[in-house]
Amino acid sequence: MPKISIHEALFFELLGERCDDDTLERRLRSAKAELECSSFSVREDKEGGSLSPGGEVCDPVQRTRGQASCVREGAFDARLLKIELNDTNRPDLWSTAGLARLLRVHAGGASRAAQYRAFLSDRCTVRDSYGRCVVVDARLQTIRPFIAGFVARGTGLSEVRLWDLIQTQERLASNFGRRRCTLSLGCYRAQDICWPLAYRAVLLAEVSFTPLGMSMPLSGEQILTQHPKGREYGHLLKDYSFVPLLVDARGEVLSLIPITNSASLGAVVTGDTELFIECSGTDMCAVLVAVNSLACDLSDMGMQIEPVQITYSFDTPWGRSVTTPFYFQEKREVAHEQIDRLLGMPLPVADITEAFARMDCAVQVKQGTYVVEPAAYRNDFLHAVDLIEEVMLGRTLDRFSPQVPCSFTVGRLSDLTLLTRKIKHLLVGFGYQEMIFHYLGSAREFCTRMRCTADDLIEIENPLTESYRFVRRSIIPCLLSAELKSAHALYPHRIFEIGKVAFCSPHGEHGTCTQQSLGFLNASQEASYNEVASLVSGLLYCLKLPYQVEEAQDPRFVLGRQASICVHGSRVGIFGEIHPQVLSNWDIRMPCFAGELDVGALLP
C-alpha cells in the first residue's frame, strides 16, 4: 500500500489546525490511512531521499522529471509524518494538500468546490486559456497521445512546498503512472515559456538539448544511454520510430517525454512564482485526474490556476479541443434502500447527505435515489458500493455498532479448491513455475494479438483505463505476456497459472460464465508437441482421469499441431503449438507450446 512522507508544519497549515498524534490517528480513518511514524526528519526519510554531505536533498530531485532545484536542510527543522494509505484508488491523497483537504472537510470545514470550478472546464463550459495552447502531433496517437496542463501563479515557492511538489509528482508517476509507463508529469518555469507549445513526434536523431543535471547539450541517443533517467526509462521509447518532444514557440525544448526536462525551461527553483505543470500519458482519464488533483492542491496552497487549451489532430473521448483542468467525471447513483441494506441499519436522508458532504461529494436526492457528483480530483466511483462506502466513511466507523454474527457454520475446503491445490503440486513437480496475473486486460492483448474475435469477451462498463477494459476469457495471453518480459532469462521457461476466466454465455445465470482454469506454457528451442502432450498425459494420469484427444481448429495454435482434451465425454481443454503469427504479435522469438484446462470440469 502507498506510504507517503509529508512535512508536518505544511500539513497542519493546510489543515487549518494542529492536533496530537492520537487525534490525527483517529481522524486518518476517514482516509483509510494510519500514522506509521511521526518523529523522523528528512535526513532519515528513505522514501523522500537522503541528505547529501552538503545538506541537500538530492534523490527526489534526480528522480523527478520536472525539477532541478535542491532543498536545503534548514527548511526541514520540523518533523515529517509518515502515513500509510490502505487504499490505492485515491491518488489525490498521496499529497500533503490532498490529505489535509479530506481531513479538513470531513471535520466540517467548507468545501472549496466553487473555488475549483473557477478554473475547471467541462463539456458545457470552456474556461478562457488566454492564448496558452498545446498543439498535439497526429503521429503521437499511437505513442503517447494525451497531454494536459495548467499554469499556477502565486507567491514564490518555498523550499518546503517545492519539496512537497516533487514528492507528489514522483508518487503519481511511479505508482499511478506505473513508473511513467502510462503517465508522467513535468514542471516548468512558466515565465520563460513562449506560447503556444507543440507536442511533437520527432525522430530520436533530431533531438538535441541540455537535459536536467547536465551542463552541455546531448543528442537523443546520448540522453537515453548516458543520462540517469534515460537509462532508467529509455525502454519506454525503444519500440517507436518517433519520440515525444515538447517545445515552445521559439523551438526551445521543455522536455523529452517521459524521460527528462531541459535544464533551462525545466529547472524550477525556490522563489519561482509562475509554474507550468503538464501531464502526459496513454490514458486520458488518468492524465486528467492527475492534472485536476495537482491543480486543486496548488489552489489550496493559495496559487491562482490558469487553464491551458489542448488541441488534438485526432479524436479523443472529449473532442479535439480540451481545455484543462477538465471535469469529465460522470454522476453516480445509489438507492436509499441499498445504503440501508449494506450498512445494516436504517439511516435518515439528512445523515446520508451530510456523510457525502463530509467526503467532499456533491449530492442530490431524487425519489429515494442519491445522485452523487464526484470531486474533480477523483475517479474511483465504479459501482453503487463505492458510494455506500463513502457514506460509511463520512459517518465514521465509530457510529456503527458492532454486531455478533447470528449464524454458525463449519467451514471446509471445497472439492474444487482441493483439486486446484493437487494440480499445483503436480505441475511444480513437473518443473513448472506458478504465476499470478491480473484478470483484466485490453482487447489488444486478449483478441488482436491472439488472432481471436471479441464476441464472447466481457467488457467492463466503466473502466479506469483501456488497459483493464475486458475480463480475460483465457490464461494463455497472460502467460505470453510473462514470456515477453522474460526473454532475458535462461531457457527453458515452464510456467502456469490456475485462476478464474469468464466469458459471455447464454447458459450463465447473468449471461456470463466463470470457470476455474489451468493455463500452462513451455518456451524453449527444444520444446515440442510431444513434450506438452506428455505433460497433459502425466497430469491426468496422476489425477486418475481417463481422457481422449481430438483434432482441434483453434486460430491461436498451429493447424495440425493442436488437440482438444476430452474427459467424462466432454471437451475440457486444448493444447498445442502457438501459431507463429501470435508469437510475432507478442514479439516473442522462441517457440512456445501451451494449453488450457477447465479445472471444474475435471471433478466427478
Curated annotation (Swiss-Prot):
Domain B5: 327-402
Positions bound to Mg(2+): D380, D386, E389, E390
Alphabetical list of SMART domains matching this protein: B3_4 (SM00873), B5 (SM00874)
Reactions catalysed: tRNA(Phe) + L-phenylalanine + ATP = L-phenylalanyl-tRNA(Phe) + AMP + diphosphate + H(+)
CDD domains named among the record's database cross-references: PheRS_beta_core
Subunit structure: Tetramer of two alpha and two beta subunits.
Name this polypeptide is given: Phenylalanine--tRNA ligase beta subunit
Organism from which the protein derives: Treponema pallidum (strain Nichols)
Lineage: Bacteria, Pseudomonadati, Spirochaetota, Spirochaetia, Spirochaetales
Gene behind this protein: pheT
